Design a protein with these regions (language model features):
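Short beta->alpha linker loops
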Residues: 2-5, 113, 155
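Gly/Ser/Thr-enriched, mixed-charge loops and adjacent short helices
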Residues: 33-136, 142, 146-152, 163
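Active-site catalytic microenvironments for nucleophilic, acid-base chemistry
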Residues: 16, 124, 199-202
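Phosphate-binding and adjacent anionic-ligand microenvironments
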Residues: 135-202
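Short glycine/serine/threonine-rich phosphate/pyrophosphate-binding segments
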Residues: 7-11, 31-33, 116-117, 146-148, ...
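Ferredoxin-reductase
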Residues: 1-42, 134-135, 142-143
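A generic local secondary-structure boundary/capping motif
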Residues: 11-14, 26, 46, 98-99, ...
């Protein structure tokens, strides 16, 4: 049964990730596929992009010498179902859990939205949710791209530095990430928050 998620962009994030709707095109013209992704067929996908985003997508596609080599999505979903949410959580937990030492005991965490995806990820990772005595507080802003925490910016950067540098889903080098404006990469604030809990200094 479909359900609403805490933020519209988070909902689109899950929908687009599971719809394989993203393509990264390097400045050299090389197309890199992420999350098992395929280029979005704009005429069939449910979320609308602005004229500016459509123009950027068109320019990037035109820069690729063999456009026929870019597979197109067969279609999308109109809603976010429980199965898609579960698949997002499964995949993200699998990737993030490999970042941490198995002996590391996560610090109790407080989160602003106890029903959100971040809470689901933390629970699956064995992180105790403790609103009263938490050593770390996390909040994902409504646009789904910004993580706020009780740690300083420098501590966050230090904790996530290697994880961000080695994550296969983060494009490297100059290029253009072609996407629906609602698409959030798998290095979004939700997965970043979960990774921070496992990697932050105790």
């Amino acid at each position: 049964m479909p359900r609403a998620l805490p933020a519209p962009l988070t909902a689109f994030s899950v929908r687009m990730v599971m719809a394989d709707g993203a393509l990264y095109i390097r400045s050299s013209g090389e197309a890199l596929i992420y999350l098992g992704g395929r280029a979005v067929d704009r005429s069939r996908e449910g979320a609308l992009a602005s004229e500016a985003e459509l123009s950027l997508i068109d320019e990037a596609a035109a820069a690729v010498s063999d456009e026929a080599a870019l597979p197109r999505a067969e279609g999308g979903w109109e809603c976010v179902g429980e199965g898609m949410i579960g698949a997002y959580v499964d995949r993200t937990v699998s990737r993030i859990s490999s970042l941490s030492d198995a002996a590391h005991v996560p610090t109790p965490v407080s989160v602003e939205d106890p029903t959100g995806l971040l809470t689901s990820l933390l629970e699956r990772l064995g992180v105790p949710i403790d609103e009263a005595g938490a050593g770390l507080s996390l909040h994902v802003c409504c646009e789904g791209r910004t993580l706020c925490s009780s740690l300083s910016e420098e501590q966050v950067r230090t904790a996530l530095g290697e994880a961000l540098a080695t994550s296969p889903v983060i494009p490297a080098g100059r290029g253009l990430y072609c996407m629906d404006p609602a698409f959030v990469m798998d290095a979004d604030a939700i997965s970043a928050g979960a990774a921070l809990v496992l990697l932050a200094p105790r």
